[in-house]
Amino acid sequence: MLSGLMVLHFYYWGANQFIVQRALAAKSDKEARAGVITAGFAKLLIPFISIGTGIAAYYVFAERMPGVQVDGDTAFPLLLREVVAPAGIAGLVGLVAAGLIGAILSSVDSMLNSAATLITFDFYKRFINPQATDRQLIRIGRVLIGVMVVGCALLTIAVFDPNTKQLFFTYVASHQSKLVGGVVVAFAVGMLWKGATAAGGFASIITGVVVSYAVVPVYGATLGKTELFSGMFGSNLNFFHGVFVAAIFAVLANIVVSKMTQSDEQKSSLTFVGLGVFTEASLRTLITKVTLSLLLYALLGFLMWQEIAVPLVAALVASTWTWLMFINTNLQSLLTASSKGRVQSLIREDKFWGGLLAACAIFMLYYFK
């Protein structure tokens, strides 16, 4: 959880096109941050809702269908049949099904729109028709969405085995995760290091994909057979750890290739420091905080693994530390304002709520391990 899952979360909230486009649609940076933070708090409820439904389904099926093994992918429709339909309320099954389909379409249409936008502007307009009008771009985007819908449907039919015991969500997530490690590195290195080049970013993306697919079988054939590594990570490497390893190699590839290629002076200024988001001193402070936090998280994880620390204690320590790292700058500004006779409210600062969100997520990570 502290390795590849962190990389995946950085991708989802910081580099995912259909999340980023929502932030870019905000009127101001503050509203964009507020929207992301609000969505983050709502996201924290999903595990409780999904896990709670799964636990309820387990006991319902054990009582009504004893001895029958129910796959996770069929649990929800069976709940509709066994619980919702017998309630006898007209239209209730349709209402629940409509809510499920609406939630699916809400995510799918964002993904399709994002994919069509990327292909239309980054490929079609850049390489095929630089003089394309808005009407032409809209037409191409609509055609691409139709092609992708049909293609995804055919791909699903080809890869999904209804008789498999593996959850389809896990299957998709394991393959999707192999594509994002290098993307996160390309964004992060590009924003933090002025020496990064486009070739370095491209190299990190390719390296991330190649290593993600190679590391699992290589581990299984080598380190997975040793007692030390099989005891820590198992004989088969979880794809979360594979993403983390791929991200490390992607960073190395980005640095090496960037050193070997010529950087664009104008684009080199488009970093956090160059844009004035951070000063060099504040950026070093941020990197120090992140490094110390990761070391603390790893230490707490090790103590839990050795059964030295209980989950509740580890969760409280990690979440408190996380929140303090966020609001440290806010507390300093409040003290400065107070010394000058001005009154500021801590709860009006988005870092306060961002820190609280991060603290809640870290607490759940350790408490529910």
Where are these regions (language model features)?
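Membrane-embedded helix-loop-helix hairpins and adjacent transmembrane boundary segments
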Residues: 1-369
